[in-house]
Amino acid sequence: MANPHQIYRHDAAWDRQVFRSLATSLILHGHIKTTLDRAKRLRSVVEKLITKAKKNDLAARRQILSFLYGLKTRDGVKVMPYLFNKVAPRYQERNGGYTRIVRIPSRLGDNSKMAIIELV
């Protein structure tokens, strides 16, 4: 993988918004399809969020709420309660490694390497 600073030539605000959106979608849906480089960077973001959610204290809730889109829903399910009540309890006995990256064929339009990132 090339230097990440050369891959993403956007400002920090753009990076933050993209990875907020990707992390929120991954938590709600369990898997998403994205480019391989974004999947690799998203893995560290999501694993840190799940580790914080496992603590389940007020400080962890506030830190996660400041990062995720808390009001985004899927079929009426809000992401914050879903993360703390459904996702985090699944990984109480697991120390990291909450995600899996599966490579898929390249995108036809620009031949970008694609991957599916999913919660284990």
Swiss-Prot record:
UniProt cross-references to InterPro entries, sorted A to Z: Ribosomal_bL17, Ribosomal_bL17_CS, Ribosomal_bL17_sf
Domain of life: Bacteria
A biological process from GO: translation
UniProt keyword terms in alphabetical order: Ribonucleoprotein, Ribosomal protein
One Pfam match: Ribosomal_L17
A GO CC term attached to the entry: cytosolic large ribosomal subunit
GO molecular function, one term: structural constituent of ribosome
Subunit note: Part of the 50S ribosomal subunit. Contacts protein L32.
Sequence similarity: Belongs to the bacterial ribosomal protein bL17 family.
Annotated protein name in UniProt: Large ribosomal subunit protein bL17
Gene that encodes the chain: rplQ
